[in-house]
Regions:
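N-terminal amphipathic alpha-helix/helix-capping segment at the start of soluble metabolic enzymes
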Residues: 1-20
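N-terminal glycine-rich phosphate/pyrophosphate-binding loops that anchor nucleotide-derived ligands
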Residues: 3, 22-38, 80
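Alpha/beta enzyme core
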Residues: 9, 28-45, 64-68, 72, ...
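Catalytic beta/alpha-barrel core
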Residues: 22, 26, 78-81, 101-109
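Short glycine-enriched loops at secondary-structure junctions
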Residues: 51, 83-87
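Glycine-rich anion/phosphate-binding loops
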Residues: 84, 110-116
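Conserved small/polar residues in nucleotide/adenosyl-binding loops
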Residues: 189-192
């Protein structure tokens, strides 16, 4: 099976009442092991290339590896740009054959996040790819990207309603108190 978009795989997950795992990759060996396992288990998957791998110059080589290995698979696989940092990075991923892109405008002011996401949706839809956006923040550090712990990281429902009314994305990641990384002591969550 060729690669699919998130737009194709998420309705399948909803219909079957399953979760679709997402795996961040950074080497060809890890990629091969993941793809062999999802094929063996007949488990659709999202194969994501994150910012650490991109900073190491691996965007194109990892995309080529996934495309080559996925073409003979029966199990659907999404090739996904994780936490895309700019429109230019999204375009580079689409040119490398990604079927799904995330634009992470969560650090931007709300209206700027909407504007950049609308631009990415326009470009990605023209390329036949799906789009994920992000609202809020994830506490800590993910893929060598740190988030300011002083910024509120819980998204209010009205922001989600307003964002999805303005931008038609295929998936939306929202900060709901998630925390990544290692911490000394306990993380304190409030219900505020």
């Amino acid at each position: 099976m060729s690669l699919v978009t998130m737009r194709e795989i998420l309705p399948y997950a909803e219909e079957k009442k399953i979760a679709i795992p997402a795996f961040n990759i950074d080497t060809m060996e890890i990629t091969q092991a993941i793809l062999e396992t999802v094929e063996e288990e007949n488990c659709p998957a999202i194969i994501a290339v994150g910012q650490a791998a991109i900073k190491d110059g691996k965007l194109e080589s990892l995309a080529a590896t996934v495309r080559t290995l996925a073409k003979d698979m029966k199990t659907p696989v999404v090739l996904h740009l994780d936490h895309g940092q700019s429109v230019e990075q999204v375009v580079k991923a689409l040119c490398a054959g990604f079927t799904s892109v995330m634009i992470d405008g969560s650090k931007l002011p709300f209206e700027d996040n909407i504007a950049v996401t609308q631009e990415v949706v326009r470009i990605a839809n023209a390329a036949g790819a799906s789009v994920e956006a992000e609202l809020g923040a994830i506490l800590g550090s993910e893929d060598n990207i740190s988030h300011d712990d002083s910024k509120p990281f819980l998204v209010c429902v009205q922001d989600v309603i307003d964002f999805t009314a303005a931008v038609k994305v295929d998936a939306l990641a929202v900060g709901i108190g998630n925390a990544h990384g290692l911490y000394k002591g306990c993380l304190l969550y409030t219900s505020d």
